[in-house]
Amino acid sequence: MTTLETLKWDGKKSGKVSLDLAVAKKTSSADLIHRAVLRQLANKRQGTASTLTRSEVRGGGRKPYKQKGTGRARQGSIRTPLRPGGGIIFGPKPRSYNLDMNRKERRLALRTALMSRVSDIKAVEDFGSTLKQPKTSDIINGLARLGIQKTEKVLVILDSPSDIIKKSINNIEKVKLIAADQLNVFDILNANKLVIGQSAIDKIQEVYAS
């Protein structure tokens, strides 16, 4: 179990909250997280790259020049892979890059990744509570009050973010908003800082406890 210090939106300390998630053993955690990240990135690939083989390229019915007497190497088709505009040997074809990983391992990898970032977590009691309308500058100033630099990549995790917060964060390049029940290993590891709403911590423990 880990105890996190909670902050208010104005940056002042407000109390403490516990985060208790089961993690993988040290001997296997690195491999588990690595496989989870590979799976996530592989599954994002569209797999639509496609090239034409010799049989698919248009043309090539006639012999480009006679067999003998030119002094050049013999050629039987203008669509041979040896010529510009010819077919591609062993080029990419549409395929699925999806990798499998069972649900139990995925959950364990996510919990392990999150608990490994405990020192970078900012638990906020009332994230964006003063926002009455979408305003990017208010979010930027609020993150600064939490001790986060403008150059840092930030992952904001909230239980049920309002449209006002979504629109306010949407225009900030290095800040990403994600719902507490839609966490993923890559975003957790890719961010420099994690800002988690107090209600989101409860949601995380409810959803990912097992």
Swiss-Prot record:
Where is coiled-coil annotated?
A: none
Is Phosphoprotein set as a keyword in this record? no
Q: Which BP terms from GO are recorded?
A: translation
Stretch list, region Disordered = 44-85
Q: What are the record keywords, sorted?
A: Ribonucleoprotein, Ribosomal protein, RNA-binding, rRNA-binding
- Pfam family for this entry, one: Ribosomal_L4
Q: Ribonucleoprotein: is it a keyword of this entry?
A: yes
Looking up SUPFAM superfamilies in the UniProt record yields: Ribosomal protein L4
GO CC terms, sorted: ribonucleoprotein complex; ribosome
Composition skew (Polar residues), residue ranges = 44-54
InterPro entries for the chain: Ribosomal_uL4 (IPR002136), Ribosomal_uL4-like (IPR013005), Ribosomal_uL4_dom_sf (IPR023574)
Q: Where is the composition biased (Basic residues)?
A: 60-71
Q: Name one GO molecular function term.
A: structural constituent of ribosome
What is its biological role?
A: One of the primary rRNA binding proteins, this protein initially binds near the 5'-end of the 23S rRNA. It is important during the early stages of 50S assembly. It makes multiple contacts with different domains of the 23S rRNA in the assembled 50S subunit and ribosome. Forms part of the polypeptide exit tunnel.
Family per similarity comment: Belongs to the universal ribosomal protein uL4 family.
Quaternary assembly: Part of the 50S ribosomal subunit.
Under what name is this protein listed?
Large ribosomal subunit protein uL4
Protein encoded by which gene: rplD
